[in-house]
Amino acid sequence: MMMITTKFKELMSLNGEMNAAEIESRFTQIAKLLFENFAIQKGEKIYLFKEIEFYFYNKHHRDIITHPRFSDSLYWYVNDFGGIDLNFPSEICKKDGIDSTGKKVDKYILDDSSYFGGILIRQLVSEDKSDILEGPWACAELFRLHHALEQDNNFPFLVERNNGMIGYICKPRLNLLTGKQTIESKVDYILGEYLSHPDRTELHEAFSSFKDKRYRYVRCDQLLHDSETNEVYLSPWLKDKKDGHPEFYQRLTNLLKNCDIEPKELKCTRDYWARDYMPIQLNENEFLKYQYYPDYLMKSNNPEDAETRTECTNVLRGMGINCRSTKLIIDGGNMVPCGPYIVMTDKVFTENGKEKEDTVFKAELESELGHPVIIIPWKMHGDFNARDTDKYGHSDGFVKWCGGNSILMGNHGDQYPEEAAAIRHILKKYGFEVTEMRFANKVGSPRTDLNWAYINFLQVGNKIIMPIFNINEDAIAWQYLHEAFPDCEIHQIEMAEVAEEGGALHCISWNIRR
């Protein structure tokens, strides 16, 4: 654990020569450490970091909103607005002088040697979540009223604590401008603290660029996962004699009932791929619906495909489920909760008319979801209108969370090893251990048209329903799932006729917690 404290001290050692990219990288690394590895202890009570903001000024990072101060690193500091900061190393000259009115003053000299800043604690939550300190003033209350003559063991201090894998999102800092205040008037007011400073216009421009920087880090609530769900819904189209698979539907519903899961029926659907148009459940009381306009329906060369698009608002009517909405275009199958993250393929960029790796859009996506997103690469192989082409780009065809920091990945690497390696590398960068399902070196003639679908299984609580196809890979896939989910009951169902259409059990179902 001491290694974590040593690393934290190193990261906190910002200085006057660091460039903006280095500083921003430090912000992110420090936030991750504070959320995952530290807490504030006051007496016997432990508080976890819920929301923090970063401020730092040097000649390469002129964040003029930062309060000037003298300090060594890792000192608590009550700022000018009554909030509490955790300081970075801070040095700035101060001297006597005469202001514009001829009055004697003792003010700061802001020059290229100056550097200062800290981390504003904006929100804390007790470890049992019973006590939330919301706002800088409330957080600073922890540091008030301590004994003047005796050593006070209740004074707050940082402690190492393993908080597990924590998700967070970045947002712009709050209250940098108030009311009708302009950038110029705000900066001019700040410059009143200084006897001398760099060019005023340059600082106006700097503030303009910094005011929307996403230097506020917000810890996310825990995502709901399949292991916590207890209800399953299916579309009645699945049992349609003409367009569905009635025999499979009967076998599936019987299997679910044998697992003590009573399947329920969705209304007003237009096809049986329920996952893609139904809302994602983020936690027990929060659902998010999105714009469902997938290119594989709307841009298909078969005009009838567009007519099968389901509007989930109609489906939800009468279900007693309240949703918030986003205008972003998303497919439900392209959102796989993995620990604190939602894993999506980069197809979400193109569906929303954005360039891949557009950082502004990714920030918007995370803000709308309220959770951090891991983007994995996806590439379409084959002709868009060919029946056997994966034109969907759904992450539920690639990965599944197994609990903790473990992810089970499908057998994409059998056909496209470089693409699979890129996905695995990204997931490992976020702290996950990845197990890939592989069949190419274990069976003579692998059925690539079917064996991709094992990863698209359905999990409800501790029950797993996995697809099988009466092929050699079935037993190998069962072993992968058994090792990844040792505490789950694993049941199997033959469904080649569905998988050949490009989806499997996760695609045709909608499981939630009620």
Where are these regions (language model features)?
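The feature marks the mature, well-folded catalytic cores of soluble enzymes
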Residues: D221-R514
